[in-house]
Every structure is written in structure tokens, then in C-alpha cells.
């Protein structure tokens, strides 16, 4: 005799799968930008860009998506050597905060290719830019 599984069981399974995948991928959902769209992406408002490389994925800035009041993007220096040269990126990860296309602050990796700044430090930089707009 076949067991009958009602629609609510299927719905329950689908919801669990969706919640699982949202929880495991949302933290990694920064847009990777290239040389062709870089200038247009950083031109407006406050933008935080992480310059990174696939070979140093273990040290990427994992909290990039948790920053508030800014757009966040990533640049893979292995595919954007011109941007690496233009912005003088010598170690990855390097996080650069832009305001209307102008570099305001930079946070570099140390000799172990680990970012020395934490989320709070970078968020403070963003908050300072916002506060200065009201002075």
C-alpha cells in the first residue's frame, strides 16, 4: 500500500530547502565588478570595494555584506589587472571606501594577506563620511 503525502508536507520541505539556501548564500552575495563597469558603480554615493583574488579566498572580508549605508562590490584582481595597477593594490584583500567616485579611505592586508581592519572600523569610516555631509 502506498503512503499518501499531502501537499503540506511538500510545502514544508520546499520552505526548509529555501531557508537553508538563503542562509548559506546570502552572506556571499556581493556583486563582482569589472574594469568596464567599475567607474559607473563607484560614481554615486558611498561604495565599499574589496579587491581580492581567488587564490586568497580564505582571507576575504567575510563581513562585507554586513556594512550599512553603502553599496558593496568586489573586484577580482586576477581578471582586472588594470584596476589593480590604477589603484596600486599590492596585497589582497584590500578594502577601499569611495564617496561619489573619490577614494576616502583604504584598508590593506598585512604581510600574511589578512585584512587588518574589522567591520567596526570600516563602518566607522562610512559613518564619518555620512556625518561630514551634514557639516
Set out the residue ranges of the language-model regions.
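Bacterial N-terminal signal peptides that target proteins for export
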Residues: 2-14
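Structural micro-motif
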Residues: 87-98
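Thiol-based oxidoreductase modules, predominantly thioredoxin-like and allied folds used
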Residues: 51-55, 68-83
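Local sequence-structure signature of Cys/Sec-based thiol-disulfide redox active-site neighborhoods
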Residues: 32-68
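N-terminal leader/targeting and pre-domain segments
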Residues: 25-44, 121-135
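Non-catalytic, surface beta->alpha helical segment in thiol-disulfide oxidoreductase systems
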Residues: 97-135
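Bacterial N-terminal signal peptides
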Residues: 12-24
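Extracytoplasmic/secreted cell-surface and envelope-processing proteins
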Residues: 58-60, 83-84, 105-107
Amino acid at each position: 500500500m502506498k503512503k499518501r503525502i499531502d501537499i503540506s508536507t511538500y510545502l514544508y520541505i520546499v520552505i526548509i530547502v529555501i531557508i537553508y539556501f538563503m542562509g548559506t548564500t546570502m552572506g556571499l552575495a556581493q556583486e563582482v565588478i569589472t574594469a568596464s563597469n567599475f567607474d559607473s558603480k563607484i560614481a554615486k554615493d558611498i561604495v565599499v570595494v574589496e579587491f581580492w583574488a581567488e587564490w586568497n579566498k580564505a582571507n576575504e572580508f567575510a563581513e562585507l555584506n554586513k556594512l550599512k549605508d553603502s553599496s558593496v562590490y568586489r573586484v577580482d584582481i586576477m581578471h582586472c589587472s588594470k584596476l589593480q595597477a590604477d589603484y596600486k593594490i599590492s596585497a589582497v584583500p584590500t578594502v577601499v571606501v569611495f564617496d561619489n567616485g573619490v577614494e576616502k579611505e583604504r584598508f590593506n592586508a598585512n604581510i600574511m594577506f589578512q585584512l587588518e581592519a574589522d567591520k567596526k572600523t570600516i563602518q566607522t569610516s562610512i559613518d564619518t563620511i555620512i556625518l561630514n555631509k551634514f557639516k
